[in-house]
Design a protein with these regions (language model features):
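Bacterial N-terminal signal peptides that target proteins for export
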Residues: 1-6
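Bacterial N-terminal signal peptides
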Residues: 7-14
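Short, conserved beta-strand element in jelly-roll/cupin
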Residues: 85-86, 96-113, 243, 262-279
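Short beta-strand His + acidic residue motifs that chelate non-heme Fe in jelly-roll/DSBH
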Residues: 93-94, 113-114, 131, 136-144, ...
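A short hydrophobic beta-strand segment most commonly corresponding to one strand
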Residues: 130, 144-161, 296, 311-330
Length: 340
């Protein structure tokens, strides 16, 4: 596909959640989606550390012999994300991000959080911890195994530490100085809350696709689907399985074709919270992920997601800097219609 191509795309007719944004023939009698022109640059451009797939198993191999480690997995114009492991008993001292919020997504183990203005709480597998800007917080690993989590911040965030505690180590190009200012933790406004757990608040509560985080350059929504609709006790069929598992008569996937949808500018990415998820990415290929893995669609990339685990729930936690519009392709409208 040529870069800088004026491509026709479909814009979802309503500014609904990531889980419900659809292109093409609208549901509930909405009629056809509106069509628009957008200037599309070449997709599948990944600048390190960004990559289509970060596999948890490979991260563990990279840090073999280490219990506590941190790996930068995403750094783009909107977000800065690290994958983290903490040994049992590891403590992280009080700190604050004065101008920006922070999200922790716990993959395994237990992490106990103390956040200003909130009751102390322990985050376990499936937890999404949402810390408002200007909130002093500390945390520690309380499980008897290593805890794993993804920390997500807006790009160019800064951290300060209360002067009552020890100063942090200086960067190679900086000096730690004492500053003075007053702070007030930002208030939670719906849908934001201190802690959300995908297993209890989405799967058990039949609220797949609910927006868990929507703040400045931070968005998170667990997309829940069942390949076998008989296992879905919520009674809404397969839910959000995207394009679903591959079928025997499917043609070979061509990453240089037009399929699925794009987003006009920002990247979209996903943390697999349970089940198996595949991602097809323009000019890049097809990737298969399991719980704890991270998939990333680079900006302006045609992409198509699918739930693959034949049994049980499949959840991909949709992440990004914004609540993105799904701009469906019009060249092959039957390929990836309604996937997220």
């Amino acid at each position: 596909m040529k870069t800088s191509l004026l491509a026709a795309v479909c814009l979802a007719a309503s500014f609904s959640s990531v889980a419900s944004g659809q292109g093409g023939q609208g549901k509930g009698g909405r009629g056809p989606a509106q069509t628009w022109w957008v200037n599309k640059t070449g997709g599948g451009v990944y600048k390190p550390p960004n990559r289509p797939l970060w596999k948890l198993a490979e991260l563990k191999q990279m840090h073999a012999g280490q219990n506590t480690w941190q790996e930068q997995i995403i750094l783009d114009p909107e977000q800065d994300a690290t994958y983290n492991s903490g040994a049992p008993g590891k403590k992280y001292t009080a700190r604050m991000h004065p101008d920006t919020p922070t999200v922790f997504v716990v993959v395994a183990g237990e992490v106990h959080f103390n956040a200003e203005g909130q009751e102390p709480a322990t985050a376990t597998r499936g937890a999404i911890v949402n810390l408002m800007k200007a909130t002093v917080f500390s945390y520690e690993v309380t499980s008897d195994q290593n805890a794993l989590w993804v920390e997500v911040n807006p790009t160019n965030y800064k951290t300060v530490y209360p002067s009552a505690g020890p100063p942090p180590a200086a960067s190679t190009d900086g000096t730690v100085v004492k500053v003075a200012f007053n702070h007030n933790p930002a208030a939670y406004t719906p849908p934001n809350r201190f802690m959300f757990n995908t297993f209890t608040d989405a799967i058990a509560a039949c609220k797949g696709g609910v927006v868990a985080v929507q703040d400045d350059h931070l968005f998170a929504s667990p997309l829940l689907g069942y390949v076998n609709p008989a296992e879905n006790k919520c009674g809404n069929g397969t839910g959000n399985i995207g394009s679903g598992p591959a079928k025997p008569d499917d043609p070979p996937f061509n990453s240089h074709s037009v399929f699925g949808h794009i987003h006009a500018g920002p990247a979209e990415w996903w943390i697999v919270q349970v089940g198996q998820i595949s991602g097809k990415f323009e000019n890049t290929g097809e990737f298969h992920a399991v719980e704890g893995d991270v998939l990333y669609a680079a900006p302006m990339t045609w992409h198509q997601m699918a739930a693959e685990a034949p049994s049980g729930p499949n959840v991909r936690l949709a992440m990004g800097g914004y609540q993105l519009i799904n701009m469906q392709n019009t060249e092959n409208p039957g390929r990836g219609r309604g996937d997220q």
